[in-house]
Amino acid sequence: MKKKSLPVFFVGLLMCGCQMKEVINEYNVVPLPVTMSEQQGRFYLNSDVPIVVNASQEVKHIASGLSTTLLDIAGLKLKPTDELHENVPSIVFDSIPGMEKEAYKLSVTPQLIKITASAPNGFYYGLQTLYQLLPVDVYCKER
């Protein structure tokens, strides 16, 4: 009796695993965010877009990495500032309390790219996601 129950147990275990739903990453973002919703519109990057940082000095350093990267890969020189101006498309790093250390929220509209986090780790991961969402043309050396 024991010899028959062991194989039946393993078959049952395998069948339980077969019922799990596969998660498909439609956006080619790694790691796949917990939630993601596609919106209409595009944000157009140019040298007039300021980078606004409302966070610690360490986050300012992370934001300056964005400036350096965009200058290197796209020839765009974005200027850091502490002030957000209305009706000026901007990239904003905004610190809020209460999020997990590596958590972030990335929001992109035609007027604003905003990375919100509580810790530098979250800002770093949000920026890595933003890099993955940039069009491939940005990474071309020909301009």
Give each language-model segment a name:
Residues 1-28:
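Bacterial Sec-dependent N-terminal signal peptides
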Residues 18-143:
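Acidic, contiguous N-terminal accessory segments
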